[in-house]
Each structure stands twice: as C-alpha cells, then as structure tokens.
C-alpha cells in the first residue's frame, strides 16, 4: 500500500494513519491526525458531530436567555461555528486525500465512477426531455382542439341579423300586467 499523502501539499497536516492490518477495506475511519489534541478513541466524524451539537447548544443555551451580554453571546457562537468549520475542513481534507490515494492506486475505479455518474446524468436528462415532450404533446393537442372548435361554421349563424334573431329567441317574453 502506498504511503500516506499527508503533508504533500504545503500547509496540510499529515494524513491519518493507515488501516490496521487485520481489516482490509476499512480505514480506521477518520481517526484523528497525529499530533492533534484529540482523545485516542475520537474520530473526525465524532468531533464533527459534537461540534455541530455544540453550535446548536450555544444557540439554545439557557445562559443566553437569562440576559447575557450580546457581544459575549456572539463571541461564543462564533467560536463554536469556527470550530465546526475547522473540523469540517479537516474531514473534507481526509476524504480528498483518500480520493487521491484511490486515483493513484486504482485509476480504473475512478474512471468507472465517472462513467457511472455520466450515465446517471444522461438518464436524468433523458427523463427530463421525455417529460417536456409529454407536456409539449399535451399542449399541442389542446391547441389543435381549440383550432378545430373555431373552424366549425355550422354552429354559428352567418350575418348580424341571424345573430340578433338567435339572441332574441333566448330572451323570455314579458309578463302581462293583470
């Protein structure tokens, strides 16, 4: 197996440790990077989850409801959000490193994934085209029906006199006073 790619780019922390030998295919999923101040059993996913919960906890904390200074509240919330964003970046970096390792070790797998994504996108777009064609046929039929209705001259009497005769036939006769 290739060496970890951590530290390859400037400013990046070294990558996470490799999977234990007895568990092929299972990287010690997102274990904390060496040198980071984390408990040994903690993973990036656990930290991401706890920092996410801390963000909400800071927003609904009873301490803030009891009239704490607005600036103090803002500072506390900003710190929680910043911690969450930092851990999210570390998690993203981990997955990008794993993706890079995969592309180096198994380039055919990356190509297969790309082809699969392209097929899925083509299917989605084909379905969308079919949906639009169905709507187009429906509205073409509606327009055709309207045109057919306007072309039936037998139903409408010709001339203004015929129109007045038809309209007056529908008016009820006045009642005679008694």
Swiss-Prot record:
It comes from the Eukaryota. This is Mediator of RNA polymerase II transcription subunit 28. GO terms for cellular component: core mediator complex; cortical actin cytoskeleton; mediator complex; membrane; nucleoplasm; nucleus. It is a peripheral membrane protein. Keywords: Actin-binding, Activator, Coiled coil, Cytoplasm, Membrane, Nucleus, Transcription, Transcription regulation. Residues 109-145 form a coiled coil. Induction: Up-regulated by endothelial cells when exposed to tumor conditional media. Widely expressed. Highly expressed in vascular tissues such as placenta, testis and liver. It is found in: Nucleus; Cytoplasm; Membrane. Component of the Mediator complex, which is composed of MED1, MED4, MED6, MED7, MED8, MED9, MED10, MED11, MED12, MED13, MED13L, MED14, MED15, MED16, MED17, MED18, MED19, MED20, MED21, MED22, MED23, MED24, MED25, MED26, MED27, MED29, MED30, MED31, CCNC, CDK8 and CDC2L6/CDK11. The MED12, MED13, CCNC and CDK8 subunits form a distinct module termed the CDK8 module. Mediator containing the CDK8 module is less active than Mediator lacking this module in supporting transcriptional activation. The keyword Metal-binding does not apply. One of its GO terms (biological process) is somatic stem cell population maintenance. Belongs to the Mediator complex subunit 28 family. It comes from Homo sapiens. Residues 1-44 are annotated as: Disordered. Residues 13-23 have a biased composition (Pro residues). Component of the Mediator complex, a coactivator involved in the regulated transcription of nearly all RNA polymerase II-dependent genes. Mediator functions as a bridge to convey information from gene-specific regulatory proteins to the basal RNA polymerase II transcription machinery. Mediator is recruited to promoters by direct interactions with regulatory proteins and serves as a scaffold for the assembly of a functional preinitiation complex with RNA polymerase II and the general transcription factors. GO terms for molecular function: actin binding.
């Amino acid at each position: 197996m290739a060496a970890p790619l951590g530290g390859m780019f400037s400013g990046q922390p070294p990558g996470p440790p490799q999977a234990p030998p007895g568990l092929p295919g299972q990287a010690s999923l997102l274990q904390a990077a060496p040198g980071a101040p984390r408990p040994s059993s903690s993973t990036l996913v656990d930290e991401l989850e706890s920092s996410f919960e801390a963000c909400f906890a800071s927003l609904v904390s009873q301490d803030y409801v009891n009239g704490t200074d607005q600036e103090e509240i803002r500072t506390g919330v900003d710190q929680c959000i910043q911690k969450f964003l930092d851990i999210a970046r570390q998690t993203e970096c981990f997955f990008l490193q794993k993706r890079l390792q995969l592309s180096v070790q198994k380039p055919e797998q990356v190509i297969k994934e790309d082809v699969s994504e392209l097929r899925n996108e083509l299917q989605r777009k084909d379905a969308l085209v079919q949906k639009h064609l169905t709507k187009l046929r429906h509205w073409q039929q509606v327009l055709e029906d309207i045109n057919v209705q306007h072309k039936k001259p037998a139903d409408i009497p010709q001339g203004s006199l015929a129109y007045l005769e038809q309209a007056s036939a529908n008016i009820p006769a006045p009642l005679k006073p008694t």
